[in-house]
Amino acid sequence: MNVNAAYGWLPTVRALRKRFYPDVVQRDPVAAFVRRLEQFVKPTDDLLDLGAGTGQLNTHALKGRVHRLVGVDVDPRVGTNPLLDAGIRADIGMLPFRDCSFDVVFSIYVLEHVDRPGELVAEIGRVLRPGGVCLMLTPNILHYVTLCSRLTPTPVHKWINAKRGRPAEDTFPAVYRLNSRRALSDQFNDAGLERVSIDLIEVQPNYLTFSSLSYVLGVGYERLVNATELLSPFRVNLIAVFRKPETASTIARTPR
């Protein structure tokens, strides 16, 4: 993905990005998540991408490196997602798969849109094989971007994302019910899944590219919260990993 085109960056901001983040891939949250995901993936694994979308926004190169990569999304365009072996239109809260179908389940910027987290987490546990893992990238509820998002309506989010080069149809309402360490741990533990790790990361200020001043302030914030673990609770993204115990029985579908 062309970062400048994707975010509609001003030339002055582009120059600042090159100055402060010369290795842009290393400072990209999706790239950081994919590196973490790859630590758990084997060539024989069956993977499920929750909220896979069109494959144009959050990219990875897992197809062809695993046994099978399936994606699910309510958007019918998932059927043409080039990153997948198969794209299926379905509600991620009611997955159309048999119990114990996947070795790895993952999601990229999806949890913040889930208004019934208990149903989703139960479904993840149901379709995971014993010993399988679930990895998720989602915004941290304590970050300034998320706090601002909660105070503004969805049309404002669409307008801001349009300025960043993101189509309006790819911006969805956010409810942030799984966007803290505690919320994630509570929901997944209740579903019988074990916490492996929950890390917080702060990356380049992609939401502050509308002016040079805002971008520089964002760089300062990034440097500050990355300077000490004491400020890690205020970093922008959560990367969470949970595992289904080897001895786990099938987790029943949550009643609707």
How should each PLM-predicted stretch be described?
Residues 106-115:
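A short SAM/SAH-binding and catalytic strip from SAM-dependent methyltransferases
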Residues 95-97, 114:
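Helix-loop segment at the mouth of the active site in Rossmann-fold oxidoreductases
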Residues 46, 131-133:
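Short glycine-centered segments of the SAM/dcSAM-binding site in methyltransferase folds
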Residues 118-123, 133-248:
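S-adenosyl-L-methionine-dependent methyltransferase catalytic module, highlighting the catalytic core
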Residues 58-60, 81, 116-117, 125, ...:
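Short glycine-/acidic-enriched loop or helix-start segments at secondary-structure transitions
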Residues 1-95, 104-106, 235-238, 246-256:
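Conserved N-terminal segment of class I S-adenosyl-L-methionine
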Residues 42, 114-115, 128-130:
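Helix-to-beta-strand junctions that scaffold the AdoMet/dcAdoMet cofactor pocket
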